[in-house]
UniProtKB/Swiss-Prot annotation:
Protein name: Uncharacterized protein At1g08160
One cellular-component annotation, GO: membrane
Chain positions covered by the region annotation Disordered: 1-30
UniProt organism field: Arabidopsis thaliana (Mouse-ear cress)
Domain of life: Eukaryota
Length: 221
């Protein structure tokens, strides 16, 4: 058998070679930049939370207990009521005790006014110098309130004459003060303290304090 002549064989078709396609490269994501307005808003919110927390801590620290006031002694001298003009002249002497029940908080009295009255009609008053109370401190305030020719209502004049004839008059003591509280580095804002002491029974026949019944005042801050 004669082998085939390669020259007479048909030429083979060559397949075109495909060029490898280049794969697209992943582009790095650009760095995200926060919006400046958003940064400011976040900062303000955080600042507000910190301030609120500080206020809460300060309030819990400086939340004051009720101050305790009592009238320890009271007397009157030169008590007189005019028969024709219903005017009063008198010198009222009071010993008032202020007690700060706080363990770690001091009290600063920026101003204080003490007045005495009969049936809500003031007849004398006096301003007390500023002072400071340390924790667990008791302060005695001795003061004299002078009534000099003070006009009374007809009802009060008649009632005081009747009480005087019995030897004891019923008076009221009012205390108004501007105070602030301090502990460590925190100081509270100024507040108005009010105390009402009633009834204060005063012996008009003697200036002695024997037999006086101590009066516990009602305080409000």
């Amino acid at each position: 058998m004669v082998p085939p002549n390669p020259a007479h064989q048909p030429a083979r078709r060559t397949q075109p070679q495909l060029q490898p396609q280049s794969q697209p490269r992943a582009q790095p994501l650009p760095g995200r930049r926060m919006n400046p307005v958003l940064c400011i808003i976040v900062a303000l919110v955080l600042l507000g939370l910190l301030v609120g927390l500080a206020i809460l801590i300060t309030y819990l620290t400086l939340r004051p207990k009720r101050l305790i006031y009592t009238v320890e002694a009271a007397s009157v001298q030169e008590f007189a009521i005019g028969n024709n003009d219903d005017h009063i002249n008198a010198k009222f002497s009071y010993v008032i005790k202020s007690y700060n029940p706080e363990k770690h908080v001091s009290v600063r009295y920026h101003s204080m006014r003490i007045s005495t009255a009969h049936h809500n009609q003031s007849v004398a008053h006096k301003n007390i110098s500023p002072f400071k109370q340390r924790p667990k401190n008791e302060t005695r305030i001795e003061t004299q309130l002078v009534s000099h020719n003070v006009a009374l209502s007809k009802f009060n004049a008649r009632d005081l004459r009747a009480e005087k004839s019995k030897g004891t008059i019923e008076m009221e003591v009012y205390i108004t003060a501007r105070v602030s509280y301090k502990t460590w580095i925190f100081r509270s804002r100024r507040r108005t303290l009010k105390a009402v002491c009633t009834p204060v029974m005063i012996n008009v026949t003697s200036s002695s304090l024997d037999g006086f019944q101590r009066v516990l005042c009602k305080t409000r801050l």
